[in-house]
Amino acid sequence: ILVTHGTSCSNSTVNGVAEELASRGFVVLSLSAYGSGSSETQDVGDPRMDPSLGIYDGLQYLRTLQYIDKTRIGMVGHSQGSKNVAAAVDMDCSLYTLNDLMLNVLSETFGQSFTLEEISQDADELAARRLSADQLVHYQAIRAEKEAELANTVYAAMILGGNWGFEEKEVSVAGHTVKRTPVCNAAWQIGLFNEGRAGTGQSNLVSESMMERFQTTSPVLPEIWYNTKTYNDGQRPASEQLGDIRNISSGSDAALQSALAQRTTHIIFTPNNTHARDYFGRDAVQHIVKYFEQVLCYNRGDPATVPLDSSRLEFLMGKHLNLVALLSMCFGMLALSGILMRHKFFAGCKKEVCEPIASKKSVVFWVLGACYAAATYLTVAFVTKNGPALGFKTEWVKKFWSMDFTANIHIIFMWILAACGLVLVSIYCVYNYKKHGRNVLKELNFLTNFSHIAKYFLMAAILFFSAYGMLTVIRFFFHQDFRFWDNGVKDMLPQNFLQCLRYSIMILPTFLVGGLFVNAGRMKDMKDGPNVLVQMAISSAGLLAAYAVSYLTAYITYAQTGAAGLPCFAFVSLWPMFINLPLFVLLARFFYKQTGSVWLGAFVNTAIVCWSICSAQSSTGYYL
């Protein structure tokens, strides 16, 4: 089974799915598409550009492996990956059934002609009636070749988080124009609250295009096997419902076995999840496992082996342990910075930590904190409403910062928050200077000499490469990375390091402003621990409010009415912020306490974000 990911992700995001399939005994290739993760970007100007973004190449590679059954290859792709999988199916699978192919052989090789009614008949029977004995031997030899070719195409594909593929196209059978879809078993999985172009799960069940694929005039029923039929006269026939995937088995149901062998089955799943949980939710992954277990008739190999039930999933535990590793990496950098600060080269950078500026009774602080939370809420609303439109327009700028549009969503989110934060910090600085005579910028050592800033940058570089070394170790020994859900970092290609430097130009100012805001909020009458928690709460409050307005209301409406509507704010790419915003507050405070300056925390946070963007997202528009 080939597993692939969506836009601005890498194969790391779907490795949990791959692990669960592999635990059932499947050979699984988890593949990063062109321009994603460690895969090279294809030459966009090349007229031979692969519409599957490398997924077809991965499929061809699978066929070189001697230990797989080449007649039972499946594919599953999420979001953009589902489009890539659909493109690979179009490139690999025949639009002609075996009967169509043999009718064309009879027509083109043996000079036979057929009426429209006759091409609905069995080609073998027609050949037996019309061909001589010698011709029939030749016919059978050609048939064996065609049958082998069809058998070695993709057997099943799941379109995850999308509704692409398997649309009818016109072909010619024995001189007659008819409509056909790729000869391949097909499945779709679209969450009830799926955000984006595919729409919600429920809307797809009643969409005209989906009902046409399933050959039904009534809403498609989820988790039901449909057996579609070939037709020639323009009148689409009604498909046959074979049963619920939970109640019948391909190991014992003859009708399902026959339909799977003919590659005419369709099925759709609508789990109770959002777009980004298609590969992180239990229900969604359980459906993937169950589908391939049934369609490929395989679960841990030998029939005598006890199969592993699709409800037995362990990948989430591993992903939570990856989160522990991610946090440990961050705290490891903190520990190393403490050691480095004792070295005489860096000791001169140690500044006095200023006396706390705010207090619990500081009305200005609480008002500005509330304004920041409101700004976060409005920023979420803006970037989720505009999504893909938030890109750079000038060509040289797009080449200089060349990651795909989801990176721009993160950056513009940070820019807007930084702009709002700059206004709030400016107000706070002016207030404290006039009211208390305190220069906040000077006391937080934002204003310092260049040699100290250079040493902070050097220390941040040492910390970054130490973290990269930790990643290399866990990749080599355990094939893991620092990740949780959509949030993570991974190994990079050489050109990605240069990308990090380019992206740091625009990201560093946001963390300098953030560091000032966080550390100017230290309070005289509150211990540092509780104060950090307050700052983390302020940074996350607007995000949580947007989540409540968008998703909780959708969930409540669904629970009350059974109608699953589209969340008003499509987080999709913003889920990492639930970890990042409070984590960056924590790091900004800890690094400030160690150095007495906001610079080191800003450099380290910038390095983490650039590393995440340039390693774990994608650049498919420009060859690096």
Predicted regions span which residues?
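Soluble extramembrane regions of membrane proteins in the secretory/endomembrane system
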Residues: I1-F315
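Conserved helix-loop functional segments at active or binding sites
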Residues: T64, R342, W401
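Short, Lys/Arg-rich N-terminal segment immediately upstream of the first membrane anchor
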Residues: S311-L316, C354-K360, L447
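Juxtamembrane/start-of-transmembrane alpha-helix segments at the extracytoplasmic/lumenal side
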Residues: R312-L326
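Lipid-exposed faces of alpha-helical membrane segments in multi-pass integral membrane proteins
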Residues: V324-M333, I462, S466, M470
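Juxtamembrane interface at the cytosolic side of transmembrane helices
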Residues: S328-C371
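Alpha-helical transmembrane segments of integral membrane proteins
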Residues: V367-L624
